[in-house]
Every structure is written in structure tokens, then in C-alpha cells.
């Protein structure tokens, strides 16, 4: 079981701290095993210990564990496949937070079968999220935001694992859209 104290100890062993980093209101943790992202904010001692929100995600067996600061973000990013991800934020090297893949850079061209895998190990190593969640990271987490990716099979995180939404592969009018996408054109 990984507690915040255990994460703090692991973070410290990597030469890092849970202490406030100026300009960064959030600290993101990814539990690769559980398929959850937990966003922490600052407590009264200026440490990232207060769970703020949780998101369901999909990593992969090649998703690295460790500690980084996000170096860059993109509205759309070419991914392996080739396919595309919306609201991509680089974690480290070629690993990103991004939406479930799209066949093209069009919001109605979602790989809908992949959307239905959210919450499971389904990626080639990146962290996939629903559009509403990855857009939140893109909009609210400045470049340099600290990220920790770890494994804990016993508990998804302090806020649990959120439920997932599914697309209906038979519904041709809606299946190409991420159902969480706030775009007004989303059916």
C-alpha cells in the first residue's frame, strides 16, 4: 500500500521534496496498476498532501515509474500508430499525458474501442485520459508541474478510482467523439 508518507519517502530518495514549488499549485501522481491519476494541492504547511481530484487513466506495461516535471504541452500531438492525442503534456522522454488516441486531428475521429479501455493497461507507455481530464491538466498544470508514476495494486489512491464512461461502438453518430469532450459540437 502506498501512502503519501511512502510517496514522500520515495520522492525524497530521488532527491526531491513534496514541499511547495513556486508557481506549481498541483502535484500529479499516477498509479499505473490501478489506472488512476490523483491531483494533490498544498496543505497548510505548503506541502502537496491534500487530494484535490482523481481521474481514471490507462498506462501500459512500458510506462516508466519515477519522478519528473512536465517540460512541454501541445494541443494535438502525433503519437505512435500513427494516431493523434489531444491536450498532450509531456511527462518525460516520449511519455505523455494525452487523450485516448484519434485517427486524425479531428475531434470526431476517436479510436472509440480504445476509449472503452480507460482504466486498464492499454497504452504503449503514455498516460491516456478522457478529454475532460487531460484538458484539465493542460489548462491548469503549468510546465514544470511535478509528476510521480508508481505502482500500488492494493489501493488506487486516497480518492479511489473514478467510474468510467463508455462509448457505444454501434452508435455511429456519437462513437467518434469522446463523450467527455466539452466542445459544443459534441453530440
What are these model-predicted stretches?
Residues 1-6, 185-187:
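N-terminal secretory targeting signals
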Residues 6-110, 183:
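Gly/Pro-biased beta-strand-loop elements
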Residues 74-187:
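Exported/periplasmic cell-wall-interacting domains
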Amino acid at each position: 500500500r502506498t501512502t503519501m508518507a511512502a510517496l514522500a519517502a520515495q520522492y525524497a530518495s530521488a532527491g526531491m521534496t513534496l514541499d511547495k514549488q513556486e508557481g506549481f499549485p498541483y502535484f500529479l501522481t499516477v498509479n499505473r496498476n490501478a489506472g488512476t491519476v490523483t491531483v494533490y494541492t498544498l496543505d497548510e504547511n505548503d506541502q502537496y498532501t491534500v487530494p484535490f481530484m482523481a481521474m481514471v487513466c490507462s498506462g501500459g506495461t512500458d510506462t516508466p515509474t519515477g519522478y519528473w516535471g512536465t517540460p512541454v504541452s501541445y494541443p494535438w500531438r502525433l503519437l505512435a500508430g500513427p494516431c493523434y492525442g489531444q491536450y498532450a503534456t509531456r511527462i518525460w522522454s516520449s511519455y505523455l499525458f494525452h487523450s485516448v488516441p484519434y485517427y486524425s486531428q479531428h475531434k470526431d475521429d476517436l479510436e472509440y474501442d480504445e476509449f472503452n479501455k480507460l482504466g486498464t493497461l492499454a497504452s504503449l507507455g503514455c498516460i491516456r485520459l478522457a478529454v475532460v481530464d487531460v484538458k484539465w491538466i493542460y489548462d491548469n498544470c503549468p510546465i514544470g508541474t511535478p509528476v510521480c508514476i508508481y505502482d500500488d495494486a492494493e489501493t488506487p489512491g486516497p480518492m479511489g478510482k473514478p467510474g468510467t464512461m463508455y462509448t457505444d461502438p454501434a452508435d455511429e453518430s456519437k462513437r467518434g467523439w469522446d463523450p467527455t469532450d466539452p466542445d459544443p459540437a459534441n453530440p
